[in-house]
Amino acid sequence: MPRVWDSRLDALGVRVVTPAGAQVHLVEARWLDASQAGDKFHIFVRVQDANGQPQRDQEFRVRFTTETAETRIERTKGPGLDDFFGNFAMFPGLSYAVDIPSATSEQVTGLVRGAPGNPAANSSFFLVFQRGAPVEPPRPDDGPPTLDETTRRRLVALLDQAQAEIDAARALLEGNP
């Protein structure tokens, strides 16, 4: 199964650490920026069984450092408003890591509140872990495709033609026909 990964997480420094023999895998990770998060500044976690069914009352571990290393155990919730997501509030200036303590689990690291340049902004993460078969990490962006020479020449000719039309229109607008 391919992992659903919000590509903005890469720029934020969010990473997935996969230990040998992992039994629980991250299958989805999304980030909500300030415009999407509203008044929320939380890490939301859902744990699914091997068939993809969300499970209530599953523990998830949140690690962060203040003056000392801190670990908190939270639980997922049930159906309804929470839709099986448990949550943990984030505070500015701290970096968080999340995993599932009941089994060998992938760990998501580098979760921080806010956005680059504004650590106090509201933002949230949605993480979905699933027991069972490993997932395929997302393929890195390979960039634009390589063009064959004929296609490249056609595109350059089209761009030249478009530029000539733009130049002619500009001359008309400026009164220099």
Where are the predicted features?
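Structured interaction patches on ligand/partner-binding surfaces of diverse proteins
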Residues: 103-131
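Short, acidic Ser/Thr/Gly-rich low-complexity loop/linker segments typical of extracellular
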Residues: 58, 66-92, 106-113
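Mid-length scaffold segments of soluble, non-membrane domains
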Residues: 46-69
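Beta-strand-rich domain onsets/edges
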Residues: 1-42, 48-54
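A short, solvent-exposed beta-strand micro-motif common in secreted/extracellular proteins
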Residues: 94-104
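Exposed beta-strand and adjacent loop surfaces of beta-rich binding modules
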Residues: 40-42, 57-61, 95
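Short, low-complexity, Pro/Ser/Thr/Gly-rich segments in the mature regions of secreted, periplasmic
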Residues: 123-136, 165-176
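Short, low-complexity, charged amphipathic interaction modules
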Residues: 143-177
